[in-house]
């Protein structure tokens, strides 16, 4: 599920038309994760560090787990994700592959230095997703996804999930406004809703609220998370974000560092 959400976001989990003016005129790349996220500048990597919040709502000690680092190619598409602890020890890593048009086509995952699975997505000659196959840590086929549809920005709109024995398990349906993810619904094999989510944004395209509702036979649980953006860099990209629960209590502060490509590196 983690990988299909990543694919859905285009990262993962992200892809709109590349609007960079200095790309080659004959480039086949149509999609860009960074453009989808409405981030500005030629970003090479993004590092997010989470911090605890004290009783007064001020930033406290750094969380021991986990610092996340996303690396991007020259087209603004994610090619590697790394999670490490406060000492810099890598805990998990995912290396992504991309289609020539920029679509996310798979990941090879490791955890604590050992294989933890992979995913490969097939793209047809029209540049459309067709099938997504996962493998477990031993390389054996695991769950797979069919009936994958996508929007004009290369983001996954819907899919059907089957287990390794080809038994239909669940399906998902996403909703977007242009390239902004607005919500997602999953249903079980008989069509009953399992979960729904919804997102809200400010006028900069920054997510300010995310709600997730989980439905079981006996209970329905909704979790609402809200965000404020405290600081931005000179390009307008946020560098500090505070997270709140549904009661308005600050629960986490994330500091973000961008590495931008130097002009000479683009030549």
Identify the meaning behind each predicted range.
Residues 5-9:
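Sec-dependent signal peptide hydrophobic core
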Residues 18-267:
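Buried hydrophobic residues that stabilize the cores of well-folded domains
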Residues 11-12, 246:
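Hydrophobic alpha-helical membrane-insertion segments
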Residues 14-16:
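C-terminal motif of bacterial Sec signal peptides marking the signal peptidase cleavage site
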Residues 1-4, 19:
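Positively charged n-region of N-terminal signal peptides that target proteins for export
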Residues 10-11, 267:
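Compositionally biased, proline/threonine/alanine/serine-rich low-complexity intrinsically disordered stretches
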């Amino acid at each position: 599920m983690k990988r299909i959400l990543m694919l859905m976001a285009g990262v993962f989990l992200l892809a709109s038309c590349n609007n960079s003016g200095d790309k080659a005129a004959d480039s086949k790349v149509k999609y860009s994760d960074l453009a989808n996220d409405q981030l500005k500048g030629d970003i090479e990597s993004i590092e997010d560090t989470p911090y605890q919040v004290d009783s007064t709502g001020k930033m406290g000690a750094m969380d021991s787990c986990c610092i996340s680092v996303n690396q991007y190619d020259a087209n603004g598409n994610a090619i590697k994700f790394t999670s490490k602890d406060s000492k810099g020890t890598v805990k998990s890593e995912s290396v992504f592959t991309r289609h020539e048009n920029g679509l996310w086509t798979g990941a090879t995952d490791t955890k604590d230095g050992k294989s933890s699975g992979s995913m490969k997505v097939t793209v047809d000659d029209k540049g459309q997703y067709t099938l997504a196959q996962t493998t477990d840590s031993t390389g054996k086929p695991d769950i797979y996804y069919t009936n994958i549809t996508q929007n004009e920005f290369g983001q996954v709109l819907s899919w059907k999930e089957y287990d390794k024995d080809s038994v239909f398990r669940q399906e998902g349906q996403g909703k977007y406004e242009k390239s902004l993810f607005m919500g997602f619904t999953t249903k079980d094999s008989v069509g009953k809703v399992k979960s729904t989510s919804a997102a809200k944004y400010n006028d900069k395209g920054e997510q300010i609220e995310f709600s997730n509702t989980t439905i079981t036979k006996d209970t329905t649980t909704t979790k609402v998370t809200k965000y404020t953006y405290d600081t931005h860099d000179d390009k307008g990209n946020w560098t500090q974000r505070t997270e709140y629960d549904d009661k308005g209590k600050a629960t986490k502060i994330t500091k973000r560092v961008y590495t931008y490509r130097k002009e000479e590196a683009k030549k």
